[in-house]
């Protein structure tokens, strides 16, 4: 199964990705985690990505595409994967289409979490305090929200035209949202 989870920063994608990936026995691949790992390791891609992340901007497509391609080529992703935070641009949609087509497979579904903007800002500010994430200041959060609406939200329309989008209300307890996702995907969660 090849899935994408979309929604604005703070919508709960990472949390839900863990449950979806566990159910389908596929890796949850988060571009945020890939970026942070490269930054921590001080790789050339990580140094470049850090400049953009610190400014609350998205990392350029060519850097992101290389990181994602390398990750989905790893053995644990051969049978499928769940992407969190990719694609974010039309060019990345086209790049991902090519990556998946090259393997002889297709994208199965896009889960789109919908969450109120004020709820998101509150979630991210709380997460910044708990996790000590320096990239989650209020100004950076609002900038990412603006970038999401401007650049990423239109991708949902592309996937809607392909009849792949399953919109799910992301407000509520984690298990409630997970149940909605499985219902949208017509999957009965295992206990």
Curated annotation (Swiss-Prot):
Question: Could you tell me the Gene Ontology terms of the biological process aspect for this record?
Answer: AMP salvage
Give the binding site residues for ATP. Answer: 10-15, 127, 172
**What is recorded about the protein's domains?**
Consists of three domains, a large central CORE domain and two small peripheral domains, NMPbind and LID, which undergo movements during catalysis. The LID domain closes over the site of phosphoryl transfer upon ATP binding. Assembling and dissambling the active center during each catalytic cycle provides an effective means to prevent ATP hydrolysis.
| Database matches in SUPFAM superfamilies | P-loop containing nucleoside triphosphate hydrolases
GO CC term (a single one): cytoplasm
Gene Ontology MF annotations: adenylate kinase activity; ATP binding
Instruction: Please state the pathway this protein functions in, per its UniProt record.
Output: Purine metabolism; AMP biosynthesis via salvage pathway; AMP from ADP: step 1/1
- Provide the taxonomic classification: Bacteria, Bacillati, Actinomycetota, Actinomycetes, Propionibacteriales
Q: What is this protein called?
A: Adenylate kinase
Query: Where do the record's region annotations for NMP lie?
Result: 30-59
What the record says about family reads: Belongs to the adenylate kinase family.
Q: Which gene encodes it?
A: adk
Task: Name its species.
Answer: Nocardioides sp. (strain ATCC BAA-499 / JS614)
Cite the HAMAP family for this sequence: Adenylate_kinase_Adk
The segment annotated LID runs over 126-136
**Main localization, broad class:** cytoplasm
Question: Which annotated residues bind AMP?
Answer: 31, 36, 57-59, 85-88, 92, 133, 144
Please verify whether the record's keywords include Cytoplasm. yes
NCBIfam families (alphabetical): PRK00279.1-3, PRK14527.1, PRK14528.1, PRK14531.1, PRK14532.1
Q: What top-level class of enzyme does the UniProt entry assign?
A: transferase
E.C. code? 2.7.4.3
């Amino acid at each position: 199964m090849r899935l994408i989870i979309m929604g604005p920063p703070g919508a709960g994608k990472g949390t839900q990705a863990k449950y979806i990936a566990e159910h389908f026995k596929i890796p949850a691949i988060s571009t945020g985690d890939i970026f942070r790992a490269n930054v921590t390791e001080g790789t050339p891609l990580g140094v470049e990505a850090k400049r953009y992340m610190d400014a609350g901007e998205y990392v350029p497509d060519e850097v992101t595409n290389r990181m994602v391609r390398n990750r989905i080529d790893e053995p644990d992703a051969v049978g499928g994967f769940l992407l969190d935070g990719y694609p974010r641009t039309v060019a990345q949609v086209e790049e991902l289409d090519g990556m998946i087509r090259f393997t002889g497979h297709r994208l199965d579904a896009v889960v789109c979490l919908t969450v109120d903007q004020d709820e998101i800002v509150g979630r991210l500010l709380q997460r910044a305090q708990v996790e000590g994430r320096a990239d989650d200041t209020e100004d950076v959060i609002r900038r990412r929200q603006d970038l999401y609406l401007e650049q990423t939200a239109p991708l949902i329309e592309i996937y809607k035209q392909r009849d792949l989008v399953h919109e799910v209300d992301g407000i509520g307890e984690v298990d409630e949202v997970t149940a909605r996702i499985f219902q949208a995907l017509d999957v009965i969660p295992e206990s």
